[in-house]
Amino acid sequence: MSRRAYAEMYGPTTGDRIRLADTELLIEVERDYTIYGEEVKFGGGKVIRDGMGQSQLSAADVADTVITNAVILDHWGIVKADIAIKHGRIAAIGKAGNPDIQPGVTIAIGAATEIIAGEGLIVTAGGIDTHIHFISPQQIDEALASGVTTMIGGGTGPATGTNATTCTPGPWHMERMLQAADGWPINLGFLGKGNASRPQPLVEQIEAGAIGLKLHEDWGTTPAAIDNCLTVADDTDTQVAIHTDTLNEGGFVEATVAAFKGRTIHTYHTEGAGGGHAPDILKVCGEPNVLPSSTNPTRPYTINTLDEHLDMLMVCHHLDPSIAEDLAFAESRIRRETIAAEDILHDLGALSMLSSDSQAMGRVGEVIIRTWQSAHKMKMQRGALAEDSARNDNFRAKRYVAKYTINPALTHGIAHEVGSIEPGKWADLVLWEPAFFGVKPAMIIKGGMIAVAQMGDPNASIPTPQPVHYREMFATRGGALARTSLTFVSQLTLDAGIGARYGLAKRLVPVRGCRTVTKRDMIHNAWQPAISVDPETYDVVADGALLTCEPAAVLPMAQRYFLF
């Protein structure tokens, strides 16, 4: 059987290479967990039939769902395997079938097992977006359809504060937002407002349900507020996210780093145009306690990036273009040199995460697509990474997928539940046809159940006739919704019994390990260079090397995918 014929029947195997969408990125299957000649496949005349690939075992001893012959792309590897789901969690990665008659079976299929055909598909962990302004609930539909299954941030709707900052302020708003979370088929966590110089206003927000706290310059990110917020976080094992002081009113970047006192913090907008200390916020990438992320409007740097940012910034931060000081504030944040350096710092693993900044200078449905566009641009401009071979871009792919999966999960203390495809974790999985990888998922699974899929006319005789578009599936309806998605809170919240007090239906899961994670723990993205930014030219130098690149004029994963 030729390799081509085998791949068409059972999907790629060890040594086969797959192009990601229309990029120049190639991944190569490193290992095949299935056994040649013993593969399982569902369909008429196929293997998964009673007495053949399907065993006589009862429900307790078989998988609830098996994704057959899928290529897994995750931070830990690129492998071909069957994936078992049981009770909403990933149960195993291995070889599925009937252990009574087949060798090497690690996943039993029975009458209680549903099958999802993964032949020819790539499976990734559900994306995690940790920079959400909850301005409109419709963002969740867009995010979920793009492959994001967990959203962390703050807000209360299109309030002026939420339009600019990712904070859900105070116990009353926190209770209302947690109640609203019960209505959406996605994992959610809310950040309280961290801008206060005394502990009690912050502690009460964490008790009320906050997953962590957010410091934002628009509320006054002073050294005193930073110190107080991190002290409360240390006491409650929660994470702090920070948008630093663009105007350098409360101090320069050195004063902010000093206020951290070596404590762990997630720095939003560690990048070219999102805000923070101008012009040298990128310096914090070299700090061992700083977990840096950037947002997707500047990803990747293109010929259009600068032009779109000024108006975007004026709207999001409630600025008036007729006021000279407001205009100067906006222009200080948009620097081509630091945006270009951001591309390279992502490629070298100094910037550990990528998120959206939804409707507040960011596009909630484009975290994944812009991650892979950035990876493509860097390959075209900088060539293969030292860790990669001439045959594939496996390391680069692992580095970039980690930016929106495992590293955000580690940062916010939820990696014990989500962020990777590993046994025991919540079964949030995204299935992709390789030609549409990163652009349009084929199916999104939440908590082991199909939540969103590309579906044709519901009145048609088969599932595929036009119009085919994303439609919500049964995991988004009735009681299944609350049993297939999670709400993340602090242990303090859980101890306070807010689930019963608020009348919440979703399972509440406490975050953990938020205060011990460091830059060293950022998988494939742990580089800590010494960075300097010239205050006059904005040139960025990392470990003695000037970081600069040209803007892209053309990108993959773009117009050819969105003609209709």
From Swiss-Prot:
- Modified how: Carboxylation allows a single lysine to coordinate two nickel ions.
| Record: residues binding Ni(2+) 1 | H131, H133, K214, D357
Needed co-factor(s): Ni cation
GO biological process assignments: urea catabolic process
Highest taxon listed in the record's lineage: Bacteria
Q: Under the cellular component aspect of Gene Ontology, which terms does the record hold?
A: cytoplasm
EC number(s) recorded for this UniProt protein? 3.5.1.5
GO terms of molecular function: nickel cation binding; urease activity
Please name the PROSITE patterns in this protein's record: UREASE_1, UREASE_2, UREASE_3
Q: Which residues form the Urease domain?
A: 126-564
What UniProt keywords apply to this chain's record, in alphabetical order? Cytoplasm, Hydrolase, Metal-binding, Nickel
Extract the CDD domains matched here: Urease_alpha (cd00375)
Q: How does it assemble?
A: Heterotrimer of UreA (gamma), UreB (beta) and UreC (alpha) subunits. Three heterotrimers associate to form the active enzyme.
| Family (UniProt) | Belongs to the metallo-dependent hydrolases superfamily. Urease alpha subunit family.
Record-given protein name: Urease subunit alpha
The species this protein belongs to is Burkholderia thailandensis (strain ATCC 700388 / DSM 13276 / CCUG 48851 / CIP 106301 / E264)
| Upper classification of the organism | Bacteria, Pseudomonadati, Pseudomonadota, Betaproteobacteria, Burkholderiales
